Amino acid sequence: MAYLDGDAADGVARARPRSRFVWIAIAALAFAVGASAVAALMFRSGGGATLGGTTAATWVDRDGDGVLEHGPGEPLLERTELAPSARVRGVLAAFAQITDAHVLDEESPARVEMLDRVGGRFGSAFRPQEALTGQVLAAAVAALNRLELDGVVVTGDLVDNMQANEFDEALAILGGGRIDPGSGARRYEGVQAASVADPFYYRPDVDPPRRPGLLERAQLPFWAPGVRAPWYPVVGNHDLLVQGNVAPSAETRRVAVGSRKLVTLNEQALAAAAAGAVDARAAARLLAHGLPGRSMQVTPDRRRREFSAREAVERLRRAAGLGGGGGALLDYTFDLGRAVRAIVLDTTRRDAGAGGIVRPRQVAWLRRRLREAGGRWVVVFTHAPLASSEGGGAALAALDGSRRVVAAIAGHVHANSVQPRRSGGGGYWLISTASLVDFPQQARAFRLVRTDGGVALETWLVDHDDRTLARVSRELAFLDFQGGRPRGLAGARRDRNVRLFLATPRAVRR
């Protein structure tokens, strides 16, 4: 079976423990009640260093055998590129980020799993853990609910393929209650069935690591606690575009609610994809024009219909309690406590393309919102990072002109990264966070704290709850040979649990 790799290297750097006995106690507690429960016991409202999450304990592969075990966490690493270290005096705001959950309908005819064998840009078309995306989102919410937060920001790609039933499931998880993840027939119908002869797909009933009955359990209803804090949506390319790349059409809508699911491309189509003749946009067209290869029969389901971009944006607005009728773009502001103004900027294209875009009118809007923030600290949220988005340079220039910007926080790239950006106003931090769908499957928590020299942004990763099928998802994601571990998506030590110092605001140098 080609998809899982048992020769896994340790994907998490471990800090040297300050006290052997302290870490033994923490590890024992984590083993007994789960690493995420330790977060609830260790999160403080003051300036202490023991924040919980992966600062206390996390999952590691100690001996490289591909099996994750509880291990010590990573204390906050102080980063002083923009300002010197200073004593923490108190908390101004606490918030969290969930990104790229990619809640998906793994049985949908609109998926293109067969392109995964080509690798490269199609390396995430199929994942061995993809039947468990809803359970992972619910487990991440449960872990964050143990923290006292002013808000949770969902920075895009909440769903994978803009289908109505994907939105139904994802939004129900955020709202809380009984979740039914199934579509079509109650039994599993998809490429991971034991009856599918293609050895490329991981089939948990027959392939190692064997998980008999996993697909059936993945279809069963489960309970989601719902986000306890207010939550705020950011729209991503997979929320609005087919396969995250093209606008829906009559053809793609027909395929999504149909009964034929492509399993394997024919030799001609596979050769074209391997040679680069098939890009992500062509993949959507491929679905709509003939299914060139072996397919399987699945039970059709009208709930798989594809949303329009406007429908998706309005659905997100209403679910988060933002009201309706706010325009085509999901640009808005909100407050995190009394000291922080959050600005959400919609970087998602409406026609085609996965890359981010910032329109000129959005830059003007952003400048107005920065002025309106007054004396509040400012955090900007996008799906695609501004630095890699078309027009993002102008948005960054607007942020450079503010003395109150703390960070620009994004998802999309499925990787942890924390980079300083120097500016005339003193500088701020560019932060991206790994996804919930690929290893390491973590959320990110933040605290903005006062210091003797200004402020600091503390940020650390949070493992999802260990007591559900989400744990199986993390184990499979760790073994995915095209997944987050071999691609280094967890980032370096400096990209994970850090305290980011900023200086007292000063006049902007022009």
What residue ranges belong to the model's regions?
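Hydrophobic alpha-helical membrane-insertion segments, chiefly the h-region
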Residues: 31-42
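Metal-dependent catalytic neighborhoods of phosphoester/phosphodiester hydrolases
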Residues: 154-175, 204, 216-219, 242-256, ...
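N-terminal Sec-pathway targeting helices
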Residues: 14-30
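Terminal targeting segments of Actinobacterial cell-envelope proteins
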Residues: 1-19
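Active-site environment of divalent metal-dependent phosphoester hydrolases
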Residues: 104-105, 160-162, 239-244, 351-352, ...
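Active-site neighborhood of phospho(di)ester-bond hydrolases with catalytic His/Asp-centered motifs
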Residues: 97-99, 151-157, 227, 232-237, ...
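Active-site-proximal segments of metal-dependent phosphoesterases and phosphodiesterases across multiple
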Residues: 349-364, 368-410
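Metal-dependent phosphoesterase/phosphodiesterase active-site architecture
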Residues: 3, 10, 43-145, 150-151, ...
